[in-house]
Amino acid sequence: MSHNFHVIIPARYHSSRFPGKLLQEINGITVIERVYRQALLAEPKSVIIATDHDEIADRAIQFGAEVVITSHTHQTGTDRIAEVVAKGSFAPDDVIVNVQGDEPFIRPKLIQQVACSLTKTKAPVSTLCWPISSLQILNNPNVVKVVCTRDNHALYFSRSAIPFHRDDKNAYSNTFRHIGLYAYRAAFLLEFVSWPPCALEQIECLEQLRILWSGFSIRVDEACEEPLQDINTKEDLILAQQYFLDTFNV
């Protein structure tokens, strides 16, 4: 049974920290194919890989994926999936889920959750978070933190430790890390990428701040399952390969 949403996977080859990571293999299967397989398990209406790289496109076609070739000038994955939406026959209210191409173990239930959340809110965007479990994670600028209202809408995203525990600098209770999984209404996605970057976004290097700065809300739900590590470095790839061996007893 398919669900009423579409998945688009932005697949960039020239990652700054680990170029070509999507074509690296985990037990004989490329990272991008593993992401694609996980997305299919969420049972969306469609799964599309958006890329500007010939080898990624060729590999994706070989394993049966629908591929859209996009511009090489895009600065973000959101810009890339917006091009796919602009080229396609999507309705304005269609739900588009942006699944990052470097998450080979993305949980299908999280994809379903973020899509379902968008259908139950007036916010034009939904995303997920997870409780922070250590001071090290809280203080890591590569981990994006989020604080929310009582009705689960984002107040702010930051690379800094928020909220700041004034009376106990070693505390991390009631802190949450953002999970970079988004669902958008198709029409809003196209509107969003037409806006120029805002100052806050440029300071933090977090494009979702453009949405808040522009006066729109982002629904944020706690993930129904703990998210697994994405792949940003060669060390992450080694950990992912070991995780696969440990989990599946290969």
UniProtKB/Swiss-Prot annotation:
Q: Which SUPFAM superfamilies match?
A: Nucleotide-diphospho-sugar transferases (SSF53448)
Which InterPro entries does the record associate with it?
Cytidylyl_trans (IPR003329), KdsB (IPR004528), Nucleotide-diphossugar_trans (IPR029044)
Q: What are the entry keywords?
A: Cytoplasm, Lipopolysaccharide biosynthesis, Nucleotidyltransferase, Transferase
| Superkingdom per UniProt | Bacteria
Catalytic EC class = transferase
Concerning its family, UniProt says: Belongs to the KdsB family.
| Stated name of the protein | 3-deoxy-manno-octulosonate cytidylyltransferase
Which Enzyme Commission number(s) are on file for it? 2.7.7.38
Please cite one Gene Ontology biological process associated with this protein.
Answer: lipopolysaccharide biosynthetic process
**Species, as recorded:** Legionella pneumophila (strain Paris)
- Report which gene this protein is encoded by: kdsB
Cellular component GO terms held in the UniProt record: cytosol
Please state the protein's primary subcellular location. Answer: cytoplasm
Q: Which GO terms describe its molecular function?
A: 3-deoxy-manno-octulosonate cytidylyltransferase activity
The protein's annotated catalytic reaction(s) are: 3-deoxy-alpha-D-manno-oct-2-ulosonate + CTP = CMP-3-deoxy-beta-D-manno-octulosonate + diphosphate
Task: Name the pathway.
Answer: Nucleotide-sugar biosynthesis; CMP-3-deoxy-D-manno-octulosonate biosynthesis; CMP-3-deoxy-D-manno-octulosonate from 3-deoxy-D-manno-octulosonate and CTP: step 1/1; Bacterial outer membrane biogenesis; lipopolysaccharide biosynthesis
Q: Which Pfam families match?
A: CTP_transf_3
The record describes the protein's role as: Activates KDO (a required 8-carbon sugar) for incorporation into bacterial lipopolysaccharide in Gram-negative bacteria.
Location in or out of the cell: Cytoplasm
